């Protein structure tokens, strides 16, 4: 299986997703469309991972539109897609649903609560990394998967085809450090009231990698 990853900033890498590809014997290729505008084709993609980034799906950029064209092709072909943050927003927008300002800006560690049992054996609550101020509307094709105290629409699942999460399960400790070092000023105005130092002081929950494995296994089994 060829897993193609769309990465949108140097400081938001695949983290535990790469660990999963290695453990499952998948081939992983990373693309940086924001740099050169180059994307994989649908034919050379068995699974697509769309990571986060500082841009918005509403930005009028050709490569962002080309990403959605690829997502549309893969959804039509029933090939699995996983999106984190901006990536989840891209899936929702591809399906015709709005991406807009969130009622609250969330940056830092905070719990999310599971809202669906479509995917077996997920924890009822998880401590995850938030890094966003926009949100998606839940597609009619999908089930609400996660919510938080500040935001209902934290995640969705289109059964066996796509998962979109507004937050991040995938960062390992090095990924968190890269996000904070390169984008620590983004914590200003967050309702979570965490400083960059607070974020770095919180250990990455080991169960988050386990959850990444369960989510990606669900999409590919």
Regions found by a protein language model. Give the residues of each.
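Nucleotide donor/acceptor-binding cores
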Residues: 1, 46, 126
